[in-house]
Design a protein with these regions (language model features):
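P-loop NTPase motor domains
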Residues: 62, 66-71, 111-458, 543-545, ...
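A short, compositionally biased
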Residues: 90-96, 179, 543-551
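Short secondary-structure boundary/capping segments
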Residues: 165-169, 198-201, 450, 476-479, ...
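Phosphate-binding and hydrolysis-coupling loops of NTP-dependent motor/remodeling domains
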Residues: 539-584
Length: 657
């Protein structure tokens, strides 16, 4: 549409001709053509031509307004907005290149996640591109910036190959922390797995930590539906938690010995209880072979129980109630937790006892696999992956075919890990915890980690598909805690009404939009312009996003407010008031990514235990499984021999009173 040619020139020429024709009409030329004088003929020609040109120009104006109607049927112009075009980077940031539409141009920009320690969650339907667009850039950039990494791989080895590739590449370029190791936990292909023991005193220092661990395991087996059945279910679940905590803490303390920081055993001093004849620690620890020499007193780095690991606990739970109680009551620290159970057992109230701990035994029996026994019966590394002296990358693997069982085992590891990394008074290596497909793993009290771990440089990134999916596995309260604690919100295409309404209404909100109304009739054309509040990004637009398109909002950091003379401020231009929202298409260098993926084959995942053959692997795993069961049986017999029933009754707090 050329306004000059179609409107300005025709209407100017037409009006000029009409005015000129009026002047010529009164100008007598003193000659005639036919019956009319010459000026009349010129007048008629100019007036007709001028009128036609004027009508053509006015018609073109009408065509312009008519052509503008329904031109932006989906209101795309009003819903486009200016976004960040500058890459704002810092030692912890994640910067995702993107392109966005604004005022007729498809512009280049950046999603600047400048504070990942405030947490990030990514939501989107399968195939929407959330892993490619967000999860993988987090792995690439945090690895290159010297973070220690914890990545949950639901479909091992999808993310494992990427994480190991960047570990090796950045290690070659000396970008990762010095001495950083690569670890994998895998309960299916155990040859690819390191061994770890989350049930030991350095992770469980008191009974409260044991209860936290027990609660994590039970809720992960129940997919986090804590107390969903009312008061009675809450009672039985609490009972199961207390009983499992008592078992865990007993094994943490049973036969514990001190060790120095290099793993060398030290000598602990014991005294014998005159009533129970049970040996009690005096608190004095000596160098090895120097027991009783006061000048050889040392401070142990940690303590470790003789059978302090999860396989021994699981095996112990499969024994009879009589054997279990005979063993547990010998530890006065766990005795208070056993009161209701011991009373029910002594009164032969087996139905009540089964209600309190029978379900626990059924659920935990599913975890007693030879692979789980193998992984949990060793201790190859410390779960404090952010320790400056011993940092590491940890890949936690799952398998869709064994999701619930492996998810519970992984939840146990993750629970003790986050306790370790969320300590250190800010002196830790920054750590990035990335959990894609969050509903397949129960992340116990994740909201507390996000809310309290900023000072310890813990960045948490969570990926899931829809809010109802998250609510199904974490409960409504758990879902609300997660989505309201996280500061950085990113979404791909979504379908659920809950997800869409929350994003459109609570994240993007409404903005002032200019609406144009046109009325055309025979007499006139009227134009109405109105300003009103409407959704910046409506729900239908989010649901219609193609793969690779993402939207959301990044968390803001504190900035100094800049004002002019007399505290004047142009709020429209002030940096502090610019939006951190985005609606865009990611813009990666696909050639670089393709070259990276082709290079994966040169960095195969490490094998930590070479079993030589499948048969040899099965024999080793079964032998380890049987060894643990036999050790538990031997321990029970030993305790039964050392403490007769009469002595146990005398040693109980009730009898003492």
């Amino acid at each position: 549409y050329d306004a000059k040619k179609m409107v300005i020139w025709p209407i100017s020429s037409g009006l000029l001709m009409v005015l000129l024709s009026v002047g010529i009409y009164y100008w007598d030329w003193h000659f005639k053509i036919g019956i009319l004088s010459g000026n009349i003929w010129v007048y008629m020609l100019l007036s007709i031509a001028g009128t036609v040109l004027t009508q053509v120009a006015l018609d073109n104006i009408s065509k312009y307004f008519r052509s503008g109607m329904l031109k932006d049927r989906f209101n795309l112009e009003n819903e486009s907005f200016e976004q960040s075009t500058e890459c704002v980077s810092n030692p912890y940031s994640v910067n995702i290149p993107m392109r966005f539409y604004y005022q007729g141009k498809f512009r280049h920009g950046w999603i600047n996640i400048i504070n990942p320690f405030r947490g990030t969650w990514v939501v989107g339907t399968p195939g929407s591109g959330k892993t490619f667009s967000v999860i993988e850039p987090y792995i690439r950039q945090h690895s290159s910036k010297g973070f220690s990494m914890v990545v949950y791989d639901y479909k091992f080895p999808t993310l494992a190959t990427k994480l190991y590739y960047h570990y090796r590449k950045n290690k070659e370029q000396k970008k990762i922390p010095e001495g950083c190791k690569f670890r994998i936990i895998n309960f299916v292909n155990v040859e690819y797995s390191c061994r770890v023991n989350p049930i030991q005193q350095k992770y469980i220092g008191n009974l409260a930590a044991a209860q936290e661990t027990a609660e994590t395991l039970i809720e992960s087996l129940q997919k986090g539906q804590k107390g969903s059945g009312g008061g009675s279910d809450q009672f039985f679940q609490t009972s199961a938690t207390n009983f499992l905590a008592a078992c865990i803490y007993f094994f943490v303390n049973y036969g514990k010995k001190p060790y120095d920081e290099y793993g060398h055993e030290l000598d602990a001093e014991y005294s014998e209880d005159p009533e129970t004849h049970h040996k009690r620690l005096t608190g004095r620890v000596y160098a090895k072979g120097c027991l009783g020499q006061m000048d050889k007193l040392v401070e142990p780095a940690y303590w470790k129980g003789q059978y302090s690991d999860m396989p021994h606990v699981l095996s112990f739970l499969n024994h009879s109630y009589e054997e279990i109680f005979e063993v547990l009551v010998t530890d006065p620290e766990v005795y208070p937790l056993l009161g209701p159970f011991k009373t029910a057992f002594d009164n032969k109230a087996m139905e009540q006892l089964e209600g309190m701990i029978g379900t626990l035994r059924v659920q935990t029996s599913r975890l007693a696999t030879k692979e789980a026994y193998w992984v949990f019966s060793g201790d190859d590394f410390d779960l404090k992956v952010s320790d400056p002296k011993n940092p590491s990358y940890l890949l936690i693997a799952n398998d869709p075919e064994m999701e619930s069982i492996i998810g519970a085992l992984n939840a146990l590891i993750l629970n003790r890990l986050v306790t370790r990394v969320n300590s250190g008074q800010g002196k830790n290596v920054p750590v990035s915890i990335i959990v894609d497909e969050l509903p397949t793993l129960y992340f116990h009290k994740i909201d507390r980690l996000i809310g309290t771990a900023r000072s310890n440089k813990v960045a948490v990134t969570l990926g899931f598909q829809e809010l109802p999916q998250l609510e199904a596995d974490y409960g409504k309260v758990g879902k609300d805690k997660i989505i309201t604690t996280v500061g950085n919100v990113i979404s791909g295409s979504a379908r659920s009404k809950d997800t869409l309404d929350w994003l459109s209404g609570d994240i993007f909100g409404k903005v002032v939009q200019l609406k144009k109304g046109i009325t055309i009739d025979r007499d006139r054309t009227s134009i109405n312009l109105n300003e009103n509040m409407d959704s910046l990004v409506p729900a239908s637009k989010i649901s219609d996003m193609a793969s690779g398109w993402i939207c959301g909002q990044t968390a803001r950091d504190f900035t100094v407010t800049k004002t002019g003379k007399n505290d004047s401020m142009n709020i429209q231009e002030a940096e502090e008031f610019k939006t951190s929202k985005f609606f865009c298409k990611t813009n990666f260098n696909m050639d670089e990514i393709k070259a990276e993926e082709e290079d994966y084959k040169n960095y195969p995942l490490p094998i930590y235990y070479n079993f030589k053959s499948t048969d040899a692997k099965e024999r080793i795993l079964y032998n380890n499984f049987n060894r643990i069961d036999q050790e538990v049986k031997d321990m029970i017999k030993k305790i039964q021999t050392e403490f007769g029933k009469s002595e146990k009754k005398e040693s109980s707090p009730t009898k003492k009173q």
